[in-house]
Amino acid sequence: MRSFSGAVWERQVSLGAPSWPAAMGDRIYSLEARAVARSVLARPRRPRAPRPRLRLRGRPGRGRGGLLGAGPREACLATPGPPTPPCSSGTSQTPPAPGQMKSKERHLCSPSDHRRSRSPSQRRSRSRSSSWGRDRRHSDSLKESRHRRSSYSQSKSRSKSLPRQSTSLRQSRTPRRNSGSRGRSRSKSLPKRSKSMEKSQSRSPQKQTGSGAKSRPHGRHCDSIARSPCKSPRAYTSSGSKTQTTKHSHLRSHSRSRSYHHKNSW
């Protein structure tokens, strides 16, 4: 606008016209007046700009100023700080003031009030949901443990009832699950049983009779008899087989009772 008005002023001066405001046409004067009016109208509006209000609205809990404040906020506003510098228009003083007072009151007042007023229902629902999940988990684990206990007790009772039946069924050559290292059939388990018999006799000295010292070579010879009977001498075979059969019948009863007690111990 200044460059245009300057050009017009130069023209008017060169043409010998009177002073500038009188020489300016109505159109140019109206444009200048409009520009000045716009600038004058824009100056008081600057403090009233929507930016601070938008900032206050953008923050949660600072919605429409301290004019509609509740009880604790009004109590805080009753003790004002230093007055804020007034803007060009008197009415525009209110929007920045509540924000400042709010920031001050948040520090001055007890923070528990605001914490309480923020979201107690949310907090309650959160705690409820978490405790509900915990209870649910706890009940599930309880059910699982009960189920485990019941299944364990059932299996225990089954294992207790099994050996009684198996004592009668063990004479048949069906392999048993809990027979362990005593072999699947009698013909295979003869050498193993003789070894276990030797161990038991060496452990318990009160069971050893007068022939206890001779029991070890007899056992070894019996192993060789079971593996290759033609190599061993005849005298040993007749006496050894007799002693072995008697000892084995005795040992079978012992091993059965031992396995029965061992299974029932746990």
Swiss-Prot record:
Residues 42-266 are annotated as: Disordered. Belongs to the splicing factor SR family. Keywords: mRNA processing, mRNA splicing, Nucleus. One of its GO terms (biological process) is mRNA 5'-splice site recognition. It is found in: Nucleus. Residues 202-212, 235-244 have a biased composition (Polar residues). Splicing factor that seems to antagonize SR proteins in pre-mRNA splicing regulation. GO terms for cellular component: nucleus. Residues 43-62, 115-127, 183-194, 245-266 have a biased composition (Basic residues). It comes from the Eukaryota. Residues 102-114, 133-144 have a biased composition (Basic and acidic residues). This is Serine/arginine-rich splicing factor 12. Residues 151-166 have a biased composition (Low complexity).
